[in-house]
Amino acid sequence: MDTEPNPGTSSVSTTTSSTTTTTITTSSSRMQQPQISVYSGSDRHAVQVIQQALHRPPSSAAQYLQQMYAAQQQHLMLHTAALQQQHLSSSQLQSLAAVQASLSSGRPSTSPTGSVTQQSSMSQTSINLSTSPTPAQLISRSQASSSTSGSITQQTMLLGSTSPTLTASQAQMYLRAQMLIFTPATTVAAVQSDIPVVSSSSSSSCQSAATQVQNLTLRSQKLGVLSSSQNGPPKSTSQTQSLTICHNKTTVTSSKISQRDPSPESNKKGESPSLESRSTAVTRTSSIHQLIAPASYSPIQPHSLIKHQQIPLHSPPSKVSHHQLILQQQQQQIQPITLQNSTQDPPPSQHCIPLQNHGLPPAPSNAQSQHCSPIQSHPSPLTVSPNQSQSAQQSVVVSPPPPHSPSQSPTIIIHPQALIQPHPLVSSALQPGPNLQQSTANQVQATAQLNLPSHLPLPASPVVHIGPVQQSALVSPGQQIVSPSHQQYSSLQSSPIPIASPPQMSTSPPAQIPPLPLQSMQSLQVQPEILSQGQVLVQNALVSEEELPAAEALVQLPFQTLPPPQTVAVNLQVQPPAPVDPPVVYQVEDVCEEEMPEESDECVRMDRTPPPPTLSPAAITVGRGEDLTSEHPLLEQVELPAVASVSASVIKSPSDPSHVSVPPPPLLLPAATTRSNSTSMHSSIPSIENKPPQAIVKPQILTHVIEGFVIQEGLEPFPVSRSSLLIEQPVKKRPLLDNQVINSVCVQPELQNNTKHADNSSDTEMEDMIAEETLEEMDSELLKCEFCGKMGYANEFLRSKRFCTMSCAKRYNVSCSKKFALSRWNRKPDNQSLGHRGRRPSGPDGAAREHILRQLPITYPSAEEDLASHEDSVPSAMTTRLRRQSERERERELRDVRIRKMPENSDLLPVAQTEPSIWTVDDVWAFIHSLPGCQDIADEFRAQEIDGQALLLLKEDHLMSAMNIKLGPALKICARINSLKES
């Protein structure tokens, strides 16, 4: 624990920017508003007060808290003006406001409500922070330190010996300079911690104030931050507690005390505990609100592992978090956190508890801790003792006090983090302290958890914290798993987990705790019904350490999924029946600790990414405050029978206040259980890879967070048979062709039904091509090449479906032209008129025509078909339809000419018998086309409008320069032209 304060210090400044997002803290916006709003008006006074409080002995802490509160009142009055100035001095104001909020909130937190700060902060001032996150971070960081007794030492260092008498501006400047100096060392930790504070305190104000909120949160949670500075934004909530805990070497105790009760603060064990605990309490209160929103989700991740937590933490504060937790919070409401706030005023404190993952390495843990922070306030409810938590205390305590939080829907903040905290062992070293504290200061416990062990990596076990304690009433069912101590301290006992997992653990339980300290928390817990009203998800999920990962994953998922309304289709049919049950925590016995940690990390990550919604039923349940009820199905899948093997997941009762009783929490299954059930969760857990600790959920809408993107699955799978482009086309095409067929010949009466729609088909070449392709698919039967007799599938043939290759089509054209030369020559006028007027060259038309011709006697069509097939087989994708039509018309005309000329060595053609000088452009085209290897070049002659006279004047350089004809063909053409001249 001693080491934690230092980390916390360093962490203070780090998180500002990331925390900004945390602002999501809106969940507790009502409660927290007071904290933040006050800032702008009287920053200077607040700074002075803070400095004084920092430097004064613990005995005078109460006075300074009162002073802070008075300053806060002034701030509220000045709030409007201050807001205007906000952008200018937002960072300073934020930090000051954060400090004040934390201090004042600490006082209120003493009272069950801790409403004073919250009430006053109800205003949206939290926004102040946003303007200049960096300065705000620095300031808030220093403030946070000052606000928490644990941080006092750090604060003193930062502020130096600044006398309380310094002018506000001086103090601010000094703070800034110190912050800047401090930043390098504590950059990550300090800044981050600050941000978390901001988020918690400013959560009330608004997301835009995220930065401010974060700063406030950081400030209030600064102590916690110190321990787990890294997680900055998310961490803010937990940070407050964690900082408190970390800073107080005995912080666990002191922070616990502070959490339990402001009064206990004075009781806090040793050192700065008294002041720190006070600050902690304050911070917790303010941050709780803020944190609650962000933290409640992130907490889930915290338990997974610090890295996951970090991600979650950051994401909640940032857009990602938005996806994971924050999304849900905001969507469902940041209130999910609010849920934790469920007691309208107390919620803030309850959030504080959340998780405090800082137990993990400072950097990663910070993120988690912040996430957890939301739960921090709840920590008091965390009754699980560290040891117990190890076993499976981790309950997903997501008891959002529904009544209070505006966005109760998200109530379900599961904070499976606790679950994740499988690492009780790691925390065991720390745990002992927490355990003692636990018994001594159950109230403080939550705080202790927070501090607990920012240094600890992933002692998930503490995570257990959550559940049981929170619901005293619920505890009986679920807490039993936790342990007597849990039940005893149900309201406060988050401390056990404090150690490494504490961060994770913290998150969950804190959420449950309402703003009220232990008492309120107990009442909330005891009254899951009340919570459920608001959609309280207060449920303790005790998970064996092994399961922790699963719980964690679930928690994480929920948050990730939360963002989307996520109608979790999961019907917790089994559980819903027992409203009281929600508190019930099921202990998972099958999971192995080792599995848990890994899984927590992986699951969290994986869950977050691919199947967040599915990831864990609990997560889903939590994630969708609105749909939590739906989520009950998860429980159903798990089946209470499996309870022994499953950890109870926090299930939020439907938003409906009517659901007084909290639906039974979804069960978190141990690895074994989860795996067995994984089958039942069809698509929900697909990407999770059947992580052992996954709960079974059948959400209607699956939401995945992958690479930072939230991906929602559709209610129905995409059709696999064909590409989406082709699915609609057949209808269009068929009608198109049918129209043509019917118009030309009344074949296939069935097609006539579709004819009406055919005319409306778009003229784009793409559609024509698609239509033709679809036709080919429709005629998938084997086709026989009319020239070479080769058999093949329709898709391998040319568009005309008559020839397997272009060479066959061309050869067939030649043979047909010879066969029908005479008959065609006789009918030339008709054919030409057809080509000019009647025939439509569009691809689909050609295909339709060929289709019709195939069905008609072959006497007349064969030659034309031949031409059509050739035309169709050479699609010009880049040309417009009009151009293609005109080109095809000309091609047909020229072909007719060619056919007249070519058959019988062109002796039969009148053109051949005439002087080349009187040839028309078409005659020249036919002549060039008849030359070997010059078929493609013939079109160029027509495009250049070369008639007989021009042809005789052509030279190689003309062909090469004007028509880009290669030298070989140009020489051949010129040789033939010369022969014409000679003849």
Swiss-Prot record:
Which residues, renumbered to this chain, carry the PTM Phosphoserine? S263, S272, S315, S616, S761, S762
Per the record, residues carrying Phosphothreonine are T609, T614
Cite the residue spans of the region called Disordered: 1-34, 103-149, 225-283, 313-332, 339-410, 477-509, 601-620, 827-847, 864-889
What are the protein's GO molecular function terms?
chromatin binding; DNA binding; histone binding; zinc ion binding
Q: At which positions is motif HD1?
A: 691-720
What GO terms describe the biological role, i.e. biological process, of this protein? negative regulation of DNA-templated transcription
Positions contributing to Zn(2+) binding = C785, C788, C804, C808
Record-listed cross-link Glycyl lysine isopeptide (Lys-Gly) (interchain with G-Cter in SUMO2), residues: K691, K732, K810
InterPro entries reported for this sequence? PcG_chromatin_remod_factors (IPR050548), SAM (IPR001660), SAM/pointed_sf (IPR013761), Znf_FCS (IPR012313), Znf_FCS_sf (IPR038603)
User: Does the record carry RNA-binding as a key word?
Assistant: no
Give the primary localization class: nucleus
Zinc fingers (FCS-type) span which residues? 776-810
Q: Coiled-coil annotation: which residues? A: none
Which stretches are tagged as biased composition: Polar residues? 127-139, 225-257, 274-283, 365-383, 477-489
Biased amino acid composition, Low complexity:
9-29, 103-126, 140-149, 384-398, 490-506
Subcellular localization is given as: Nucleus
Give the UniProt keywords, A-Z.
Answer: Developmental protein, DNA-binding, Isopeptide bond, Metal-binding, Nucleus, Phosphoprotein, Ubl conjugation, Zinc, Zinc-finger
What PANTHER family does this protein map onto?
A: POLYCOMB GROUP PROTEIN, POLYHOMEOTIC-LIKE PROTEIN 3
- Miscellaneous notes: The hPRC-H complex purification reported by PubMed:12167701 probably presents a mixture of different PRC1-like complexes.
- Oligomeric state and partners? Component of a PRC1-like complex.
Protein name, per record: Polyhomeotic-like protein 3
